[in-house]
């Protein structure tokens, strides 16, 4: 199988792999979405019959938005844009989850034209602090390209009021949620017309940023029955085809898995699933190519995957900032414990490297070079 890698620069992490047969660069999909799409279209026209895997929210969104212009040249094994957008919209997703009986955090919605800040604060205060403030969309398309919308925290009503006033001209609604303290759980599925082809699950041990984000140390686990059932019901509601990650948090108070979001694309810790025996990219390729699929009957539980440089960032943040500055929960491990666990990970035989491979070291050295250059 010949693999080509596209990126915003001539060289990229994946393109440095020995398994990349070709590489090309395209204009930024964030700043110039139309030029990005045209570049992909030109490449697709020269490589008809290929299977196309966009890897980020923005590239998936842009290609699905104009999918009809590509469908005669390449196969894009994802749901249509409408379903992808509906699943990515957290406000819409939570409404659907409620109808399906899927547990969710207590939430108040603040519309983008809502000026009743006093009413929102009063309602949110009934939930109790601290609160999580997040936009309904993680990436927002504007006339000038895409922007990223981040998650923030409010420890009291005054902090919440300040955040709402700062977001008075927001372009998308906000979700104001109770903060769920507990480990992050990911359910990863490949489906074909709503039917599960393959599955995997992990828990996040450490994240970047430490308050919650990208998993930098994750462990493969048996899929919890409640979380798997919830993820399946949600994706079947969308009649999903392709891969998806459904993210939950295990609420320590009631031991229920509370829905966070759906990512209708490949995820950052994908290598852990592959190392554990579920090769989602190859399975999706087989599905797209119409080949017979032999789904894995199970996977290795207990393997851990570590993104070394992301874990180093986690350590630096914990050492440089206080728990309050990082918005950490009360039971967050001490700095000493974090340092000890970081060091012990180098000799833990259950931990696999997410990027580094002796047989294919190019991606790691590329990433390390860029990491060091950013520090200098």
Predicted regions and their residues:
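ATP-binding N-terminal substructure of ATP-dependent carboxylate-amine bond-forming enzymes
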Residues: 1-79, 113-119, 342-345, 350-374
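Active-site nucleotide/adenylate-binding loops and adjacent lid/helix of ATP-dependent enzymes
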Residues: 84-174, 193-195, 225, 229
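Phosphate-binding site of ATP-dependent enzymes
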Residues: 154-210, 219-232, 249-258
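Gly/Ser/Thr-rich active-site loops/lids in small-molecule metabolic enzymes
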Residues: 157, 268-287
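Flexible, glycine/charged-enriched surface loops at secondary-structure junctions
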Residues: 175, 241-246, 294-300
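Glycine-rich phosphate/pyrophosphate-binding beta-alpha loops
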Residues: 206-209, 214-216, 263-277
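Conserved metal-phosphate-binding beta-hairpin within the catalytic cores
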Residues: 236-271
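Peripheral (often C-terminal) accessory segments that flank ATP-dependent C-N-forming ligase machineries
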Residues: 286-376
């Amino acid at each position: 199988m010949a693999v080509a890698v596209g990126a915003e620069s001539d060289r990229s992490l994946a393109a440095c792999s020995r398994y990349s047969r070709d590489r090309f660069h395209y204009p930024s999909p964030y700043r110039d979405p139309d030029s990005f799409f045209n570049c992909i279209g030109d490449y697709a026209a020269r490589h008809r019959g290929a299977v196309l895997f966009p890897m980020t929210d923005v590239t998936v969104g842009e290609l699905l938005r104009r999918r009809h212009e590509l469908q005669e040249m390449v196969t894009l094994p994802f749901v249509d844009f409408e379903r992808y957008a509906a699943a990515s919209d957290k406000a819409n997703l939570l409404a659907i989850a409620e109808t399906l009986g899927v547990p969710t955090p207590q939430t108040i919605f603040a519309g983008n034209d809502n000026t009743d800040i006093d009413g929102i604060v009063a309602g949110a205060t009934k939930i109790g602090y601290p609160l999580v403030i997040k936009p309904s969309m993680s990436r927002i398309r504007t006339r000038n390209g895409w922007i990223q919308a981040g998650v923030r925290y409010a420890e009291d009503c005054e902090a919440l009021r300040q955040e709402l006033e700062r977001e008075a001209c927001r372009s998308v609604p906000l979700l104001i949620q109770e903060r769920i303290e507990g480990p992050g759980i990911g359910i990863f599925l490949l489906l074909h017309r709503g039917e599960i082809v393959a599955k995997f699950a992990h828990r996040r041990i450490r994240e970047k940023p430490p308050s919650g984000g990208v998993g930098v140390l994750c462990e493969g686990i048996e899929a919890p029955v409640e979380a798997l059932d919830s993820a399946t019901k949600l994706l079947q509601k969308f009649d999903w085809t392709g891969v998806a990650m459904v993210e939950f948090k295990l609420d320590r108070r009631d031991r229920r898995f509370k829905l966070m979001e759906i990512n209708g694309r490949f995820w950052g810790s994908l290598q852990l699933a592959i190392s554990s025996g579920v090769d989602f990219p190859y399975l999706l390729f087989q599905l797209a190519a119409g080949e017979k699929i032999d789904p894995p009957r199970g996977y290795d539980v207990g393997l851990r995957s570590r993104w070394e440089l992301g874990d180093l960032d986690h350590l630096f943040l914990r050492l440089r900032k206080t728990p309050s500055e990082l918005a950490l929960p009360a039971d967050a491990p001490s700095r000493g414990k974090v340092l000890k666990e970081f060091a012990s990970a180098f000799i833990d035989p259950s931990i696999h490297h997410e990027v580094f491979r002796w047989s294919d070291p190019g991606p790691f050295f590329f990433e390390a070079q860029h990491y060091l250059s950013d520090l200098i």
